[in-house]
Swiss-Prot record:
Keywords: Cytoplasm, Dipeptidase, Hydrolase, Protease, Serine protease
Protein name stated in the entry: Peptidase E
Similarity comment: Belongs to the peptidase S51 family.
The enzyme's E.C. designation: 3.4.13.21
Lineage, opening ranks: Bacteria, Pseudomonadati, Pseudomonadota, Gammaproteobacteria, Enterobacterales
SUPFAM superfamilies: Class I glutamine amidotransferase-like
Amino acid sequence: MELLLLSNSTLPGKAWLEHALPLIANQLNGRRSAVFIPFAGVTQTWDEYTDKTAEVLAPLGVNVTGIHRVADPLAAIEKAEIIIVGGGNTFQLLKESRERGLLAPVADRVKRGALYIGWSAGANLACPTIRTTNDMPIVDPNGFDALDLFPLQINPHFTNALPEGHKGETREQRIRELLVVAPELAVIGLPEGNWIQVSNGQAVLGGPNTTWVFKAGEEAVALEAGHRF
């Protein structure tokens, strides 16, 4: 399988997806036809989100079609060489994808050679479940099971920092709560600017920041760029 799982879409001082474009270009391998799944978008319309994505990827020669715009979404997925899933609200993304019957076809197409690109909520969707999203559950997705393309759980936008005076839980504390009730899971705390690239059977960590892996009953393990999962 070929996956590019990004923690986020924007870095300070850079344009939207700017930091990801070289990664995407490197993994295209001649692929040009893409479908975009915009359902995580809530405060922007799906048309706006699709057009924005198409515009930024056009210089790479990628032709982007919004899955919500086609008459036969399953046929579009079958024909796609690239499947792109944007960030936003993960619960909304999973709900719409499940109700439209897209989860199994997307997973199957990626397993048969399509490149999967997802940022934030799109990275969450590639995991076994969405239980490590940071998002508010604004809708009920009728279950948390997701695409299960990547075997570990990802927590995107990971930071353990708290504003001065803030008394809420740290991100690690929230992840530890999950590991109490689901000790079989391993969770990757993927900070902004980092990514996981899967190609030729290898999953490799990239990015400038320390990534953390959390497992039940164990201390967090720090990982740096180049680590192979």
